[in-house]
Swiss-Prot record:
Residues 174-176 are annotated as: G5. Residues 10-206 form the tr-type G domain. Residues 136-139 are annotated as: G4. GO terms for cellular component: cytosol. The lineage of its organism: Bacteria, Pseudomonadati, Pseudomonadota, Alphaproteobacteria, Caulobacterales. This is Elongation factor Tu 2. Mg(2+) binds at residue 26.
Length: 396
């Protein structure tokens, strides 16, 4: 039978496997592709294919990530799997591979381990909307009571990080048995059950075009007789000619009206997410707008200076700092299109942050930036990236 073409008409969702080292994340990823390939929903990949994850760069940081894609009856998925713990930390903090949901893999033989906890915390900090659990390696556990105990531990751990531990679906099985074609109850059927759960439990993300309009300002020009044009790539939503927009960040919020949208020197009646456009603003002077601000739907985003960040600090080998930093460290924070100086305060009981650490930091910027939870940024010193972070919580 000829293999069916990957249809792009199904809703798309980005997911990934997370969990402790050697609990079976990559084996599960391979098992999903192998089982779904039987119904034409994937190209089968073995463990070695996925484990040889290529290097990629995100915000100046090198990360190893494997990408596979597959589809169920309802959705098309892009799935990320990382070979090492440090890659997970970097991936989740930089948002290199966006996750709309994640499969937490826990070995039934070991139960939750330190990285299980750390990945759940990271998922919470970076705003992964939903998790499901695959309890792997049940073929190694004979005692039903032990499985119940592990399930209870996992649920308590999830609840302690504000995930709905009592409600999160847990699928029990063995990814290795599924790959080897062993007992279908814990093998193939568990993989199909997991995918049904992922389909049902991980909410369909909003498409960028359906979100409120936002465009980071990259450049500002003044066109005689027409007014001021700001250029940039629309990040989300749609802007239509005649609509009110706000200019947010760096200075006081200003309201103005979009009187024209142009792309490739052609006039359009609207611009949408993904478009590189020039937006003509009525009555706005060239000196009223600057790179680093955003154009947005009025009231949809506000400027802030104080926030809690989850950040990863590069190692010396990654081109980062050679020495630790202490409280009151003042680097630049690169948000969208511009650098803003900020002051970092370390948490109580934390003496210093070493290169290679990931940590929660309290940050205060010297000028306000349009931000919401989940916004990514780079930490820089004199134009060189020394870290990456995400806004975990806005303070003021």
């Amino acid at each position: 039978m000829a293999k069916e073409k990957f249809e792009r008409n199904k809703p798309h969702c980005n997911i990934g496997t997370i969990g402790h080292v050697d609990h079976g994340k990559t084996t599960l990823t391979a098992a999903i592709t192998i089982i779904l390939a039987k119904s034409g929903g994937a190209t089968a990949k073995n463990y070695a294919d996925i484990d040889a994850a290529p290097e990629e760069k995100a915000r100046g940081i090198t990360i190893n990530t494997a990408h596979v894609e597959y589809e169920t009856a309802n959705r098309h998925y892009a799935h990320v799997d990382c070979p090492g713990h440090a890659d997970y930390v970097k991936n989740m903090i930089t948002g290199a591979a966006q996750m709309d949901g994640a499969i937490l893999v826990v070995s039934a033989a070991d139960g939750p381990m330190p990285q299980t906890r750390e990945h759940i915390l990271l998922a919470r900090q970076v705003g992964v909307p939903a998790l499901v659990v695959y309890m792997n390696k049940v073929d190694l556990v004979d005692d039903e009571e032990l499985l119940e105990l592990v399930e209870m531990e996992v649920r308590e751990l999830l609840s302690s990080y504000d995930f709905p531990g009592d409600d999160i679906p847990i699928t029990k099985g063995s990814a290795k048995v599924a790959i080897d074609g062993g007992d279908p109850v814990i093998g193939e059927q568990s993989i199909l059950a997991l995918m049904t759960t992922v389909d049902a439990y991980i909410p369909q993300p909003d498409r960028p075009i359906d979100l409120p309009f936002l465009m980071p300002v990259e450049d500002v020009f003044s066109i005689s007789g027409r007014g001021t044009v700001v250029t940039g790539r629309i990040e989300k939503g749609v802007v239509k000619v005649g609509e009110e927009v706000e200019i947010v960040g760096i200075r006081a919020v200003q309201k103005t009206t979009c009187t024209g949208v142009e792309m490739f020197r052609k006039l359009l009646d609207q611009g949408q997410a993904g478009d590189n456009v020039g937006v003509l603003l009525r009555g706005t002077k060239r000196e009223d707008v600057e790179r680093g601000q955003v154009l947005c739907k009025p009231g949809s985003i506000t400027p802030h200076t104080k926030f809690v960040a989850e950040a990863y600090i590069l190692t010396k080998e990654e081109g980062g700092r050679h020495t630790p930093f202490f409280t009151n460290y003042r680097p630049q924070f690169y948000f969208r299109t511009t650098d803003v100086t900020g002051i970092i305060k370390l948490r109580e009981g934390v003496e210093m942050i070493m290169p290679g650490d990931n940590a929660e930091l309290d940050v205060e910027l010297i000028t306000p930036i349009a931000m919401d939870q989940g916004l990514r940024f780079a930490i820089r010193e004199g134009g060189r990236t020394v870290g990456a972070g995400v806004v975990a919580k806005i303070v003021e």
